[in-house]
Amino acid sequence: MNKELQPKVIFLMGPTASGKTALALELAEKHNCEIISVDSALIYRGMDIGSAKPSADELARGPHRLIDIRDPSESYSAADFRADAITEIEQIISMGKTPVLVGGTMMYFKALLEGLSPLPSADEAIRAEIQAEADEKGWEALHDQLREIDPVSAERIHPNDPQRLSRALEVYRISGKSMTELTQTKSAPLPYDVVQFAIAPRERKVLHDLIAQRFAIMLKQGFLEEVTELKARGDLHLDLPSMRCVGYRQCWQYLDGEFDYDTMVEKAVAATRQLAKRQLTWLRSWPELNWLESGAEGNLVTLMRQCR
């Protein structure tokens, strides 16, 4: 179908603390748009302060889809996101509105835009079998196995990365095909006219300062108390994807007595800055991207002009 005849979908990407939410809310209020969150932390219930989840007032102004859809004990993959996001996009378009996908989880945006390889679902029995082999022989021996069946993945995956190494072996044992073979086939790309924007401060120091300021505000809002409540549940631990979110891990470790308060703040801010750096690295290599400067006047006008 000609792109001009396809329904329009807006991507608004950017590093953490860059002002994505404020611009998305303006879009929702003034231009018949609905917001879909693209954030691997906002999906979790009870993780509100440390994830910078939109406030009740902001959600009243512009409801966000795909937030608070999982318990922190649960996992959520890029494939899960793609399926859920496509459902939400189709609903919004059927209402005569424009979907605006807003967030900083670049892997989700990439999966949505380009499609995903048809990898098999996890098999707990096979995972346990691989773990038992690793306990007996060591991960180096399993890495040698991977090199024999999938040298391309073995080159990419380090022997000290058991999670990815285990997954590559699991995929082969389930399907009889290597990860490399399977990833050569992808699901269909999005059948929409996708207009893509990135928003970020021009100067890195500005972003670094915003990150430090925002973490200080989170602590005043009760971030440590939020993590204390999550710890008290008893079913969560630091190996879960939810607890690997920046800020949560460092607060958890502080509450465990691993380091003092000032060190916790320093580590959390540093981890958030590293996340922002990775996000910007993704974005700089992203094709067909329109850049906006955080806080600049006229961003909404510029965005709407590009969408025509």
Swiss-Prot record:
The keyword Membrane does not apply. NCBIfam families: miaA. The record marks T105, R127 as: Interaction with substrate tRNA. ATP binds at G14, P15, T16, A17, S18, G19, K20, T21. Its EC number is 2.5.1.75. Belongs to the IPP transferase family. The gene is miaA. Residues 39-42, 163-167, 244-249 are annotated as: Interaction with substrate tRNA. GO terms for biological process: tRNA modification. Substrate binds at T16, A17, S18, G19, K20, T21. This is tRNA dimethylallyltransferase. Keywords: ATP-binding, Magnesium, Nucleotide-binding, Transferase, tRNA processing. Catalyzes the transfer of a dimethylallyl group onto the adenine at position 37 in tRNAs that read codons beginning with uridine, leading to the formation of N6-(dimethylallyl)adenosine (i(6)A). Pfam families: IPPT. Monomer. One of its GO terms (molecular function) is ATP binding. It catalyses: adenosine(37) in tRNA + dimethylallyl diphosphate = N(6)-dimethylallyladenosine(37) in tRNA + diphosphate. Its cofactor is Mg(2+).
